Design a protein with these regions (language model features):
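Active-site-proximal helix/loop segments of hydrolytic enzymes
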Residues: 1-174
Length: 174
């Protein structure tokens, strides 16, 4: 939550209103509830912030990656049937993913794992431009030492905010 809260503060300084789907370390259903909350708001965009893990115990994996929505017929939308494949939403999601990834790598110097597409529920069920960021690997002991640092959280939040502002500059009418 540290990076999310710092991002909120950065965006508020830019004059951007921020809706948090959670403000503490508690669970909010990621399959539909976060998207439902977002869809009921008047938000311009959605960012889901995570730290990665391979699930293989100790890992050598490193870096930051950003995801935007990829349709998969095996995973049909539950609450976003109308907008999940909307061309404008998808184009704006791709721009957001690229602007944020570029800013994160520039600010942190982390390994660039790239911008990828996936059918994650929070990306599928959210009716506005949406991305999911993975900010480093918690199961890599050396990377974990970096991502545990408050100063690194500050840099991540600054980069995320800059990526959002770059997106606003690139997308007309926002």
């Amino acid at each position: 939550m540290s990076v999310s809260n710092k991002l909120r503060e950065n965006l508020l300084q830019y004059g951007i209103n921020v809706l948090m789907t959670r403000t503490g370390d508690y669970d909010v259903d990621f399959k539909t509830e976060r998207s439902r909350m977002t869809n009921a708001s008047n938000a311009d965009l959605f960012i889901s912030i995570h730290f990665n893990a391979t699930g293989a115990g100790v890992s050598n994996a490193t870096g930051i990656e950003t995801y935007w929505y990829q349709y998969d017929p095996e995973y049909q939308p539950k609450i976003n049937k109308e907008m999940h494949n909307n061309p404008t939403r998808l184009a704006e999601s791709e721009i957001l993913a690229n602007k944020v990834q570029e800013s994160l790598i520039k600010e942190t110097g982390a390994v660039n794992r790239g911008v990828r597409r996936e059918t994650f529920a929070v990306l599928r069920e959210t009716a506005i431009p949406a991305i999911l960021v993975e900010l480093g690997f918690m199961d890599n002991p050396s990377e974990l030492q970096v991502i545990k640092q408050d100063s690194y959280h500050t840099r991540l939040a600054k980069a995320l905010a800059q990526g959002v502002m770059n997106w606003y500059g690139a997308v007309e009418g926002k």
